[in-house]
């Protein structure tokens, strides 16, 4: 039996910024991003003694962007439910190679300049923070890239859709060169956590496998 996870990827952790900062409809997106970023960043710094870091800024920026995306997602779901003729696409795939999420999320929100300014105020640059994010190792082949392209197309066309897959801990191999030879080691992409996930322990699903082991 597996717990459910919701992943916002253009869309838990105690470092999540307060969603109340985003819920107020009178706050525009620019102000919301800045306030949510600062709130999460302060929570990060409470756990640190060495000052600002790209890692802390990554978590702050990801959570701030996720909250804004979540508000859009909630409104979209409400509109779809109100439209009784709307159908949904449920896309199942063993792999999803979505790439790094923060850059896509900020671009979708149209807030790159605002995030860049917030990071510079914290002594960090946007390229350095984006580089800190690990690629989501949820597969290693063309099937995963194709699935990601389908989801991007659904979003571009405005089609109500969800992607369902497997949350691999070691979905890829990390390549290393030692003694002039190439070697592979498991890519533990979750070792620092994933700011885009929302753990949902109240939901459980039985996963069955056919066949037998000899």
Positions of predicted regions on the chain:
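A conserved ligand/cofactor-binding region detector
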Residues: 5-214
